[in-house]
A protein has these predicted regions:
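Acidic, small/polar-enriched beta strand-loop surface segments
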Residues: 3-8, 12, 20, 188, ...
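Short, solvent-exposed secondary-structure boundary/capping segments
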Residues: 92-107, 186, 347-362, 396-404
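Short beta-strand-centered interaction patches in the first periplasmic/extracellular domains
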Residues: 2-3, 102-111, 147-225, 231
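Short alpha-helix capping/helix-loop boundary micro-motifs
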Residues: 49-58, 306-316
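Assembly/oligomerization scaffold segments
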Residues: 1-117
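Short, basic/aromatic beta-hairpin or loop at an interaction surface
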Residues: 36-48, 291-309, 409-416
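Amphipathic, non-transmembrane alpha-helical segments in extracytoplasmic/periplasmic proteins
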Residues: 45-49, 107, 116-144, 157-181, ...
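Acidic, low-complexity/disordered segments
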Residues: 5, 319-387, 392
Length: 416
């Protein structure tokens, strides 16, 4: 029997070390377990013990470098459903007047291997998917990379971590990166590919609803907040580049369509209504040919359109909720539809709320504090050497100056 068919009140989160559940004398001291996952970010797990002698992590095998697994289980199904598999990276002690001494264990999934150190590397004549496969193999992570048709003459990892490198490549073409547990093999797998289409969500019908289908008033839901917004959205997105072999600019354009949020409101219509003829033009990376430019414009459109709808739900424990899975929402007015989960948090507090799950369906931007900090950092744009065309050599002051046009930047812009 699937865990999803059982009452959520029967579910708890259990901690395993090397495939064996930790002893009751240790598990009974668990104060909180929290597993947080998000596309384009490593998954993390935090386990908090009430620990008067501050020895539990060592005694139960949760030492730095050891592997830990968290599963949602019931009394009848001790194997349960895995929601986290990773490696312990941090041990911490805390003290509270009310709670006494606490030991805290923090672990991260296999993607943490891609965050150690920075490197400069070149990958000649490869697609981004092929690069992801090479990186995964180099770090001994099983990788599933959805093929992408554009082959680049050279893909450069420019003094950055492998993880930041893969996320940058994925964002450019509308892909996502995350490590998930393969439900068939139980092994952590690095996924590099498009987001799961919202249309794959199960329909919200039937006597026994799917664990991925919900409706307003559902007794599984504790809190729900949903919104739709056209703020900052344009009807189309474009990317520009320069084809060095042809000596011509390349331009890609894609409509703002979303396959991660499907409801009665269309982001393209919102962009046309609020933004008029304006377009969002991507200039942070100069694409090298027409195919790369087209892929970049499609990736930008996917990122913009994904953020127009925002769904946040807190519910009773549900191990089926994971990033890059599709859910359906019924009886929600104009927000009735299907959505792709971008982040989830599974929390188990045995003496307080029990097992709870929360999810967010929104855009692909990093909403963590680190992501907000990075977004606030300003940097100089368009610095370096770029292609230009001389358009006017008649300097009125005879100082040998010329005017330059940058057709990859704009059809009309000319240097002052």
């Amino acid at each position: 029997m699937s865990l999803a068919t059982l009452s959520t009140s029967d579910l708890i989160l259990r901690v395993f070390v090397d495939g064996i559940p930790i002893l009751p004398e240790f598990s009974n001291q668990i104060r909180r377990v929290e597993v947080e996952s998000q596309v384009n970010l490593p998954s993390s797990c935090e386990i908090e013990f009430t620990d008067p002698d501050l020895l539990i992590p060592v005694e139960c095998g949760l030492e730095i470098g050891n592997f830990v697994e968290v599963r949602a289980v019931t009394g009848d199904d001790a194997a349960g459903e895995a929601i986290f598999f990773g490696q312990v990276e941090t041990l911490e002690i805390q003290f509270e007047n009310a709670g006494g001494r606490l030991s805290v264990v923090r672990a991260y999934d296999a993607s943490h291997r891609l965050l150690h150190g920075q490197k400069t590397m070149g990958y000649p004549m490869m697609s981004y998917s092929e690069v992801a496969e090479v990186v995964g193999a180099e770090h001994a992570i099983i990788t599933e990379a959805v093929p992408h048709p554009v082959v680049h003459e050279m893909v450069v990892q420019a003094n950055e971590t492998y993880w930041d490198f893969l996320v940058r490549l994925a964002k450019e073409i509308g892909y996502v990166v995350n490590v998930a547990i393969n439900p068939l093999t139980g092994t952590p797998t690095l996924h590099f590919g498009p987001t799961m289409p919202a249309e794959t969500a199960p329909p919200p019908i039937g006597i026994d609803p799917s664990p991925l289908s919900f409706s307003i008033g559902d007794d599984r839901i504790i809190n729900l907040e949903a919104s739709v917004s056209g703020s900052g959205i344009t009807a189309a997105s474009s990317a520009r580049g320069w084809d060095q072999s042809l000596g011509l600019p390349s331009l890609g354009e894609a409509p703002t369509l979303s396959d991660t949020s499907l409801n009665t409101v269309l982001p393209e219509e919102l962009g046309a209504e609020l933004g008029g003829v304006n377009q969002f033009v991507r200039l942070d990376r100069l694409a090298g040919n027409e195919a790369a430019t087209e892929a970049a414009s499609e990736g930008l459109a996917a990122r913009l359109s994904g953020a127009y709808a925002n769904i946040e739900i807190e519910m009773r424990g549900n191990p089926s909720i994971m990033p890059n899975r599709a859910i359906s929402l019924a009886d929600a007015g104009l927000l009735t539809g299907e959505y792709t989960v971008t982040s989830s948090i599974h929390t188990f507090a045995p003496n307080l709320t029990g097992y709870r799950t929360s999810l967010v369906c929104s855009g692909l931007e990093d909403r963590t504090l680190a992501g907000l900090q990075d977004s606030a950092v300003t940097s100089s744009k368009l610095t370096g050497v770029y292609s230009a065309i001389v358009t006017d050599t008649e300097d009125p002051e005879a100082m040998g100056r010329v005017l330059l046009s940058f057709p990859w930047l704009s059809e009309t812009y000319v240097s002052p």
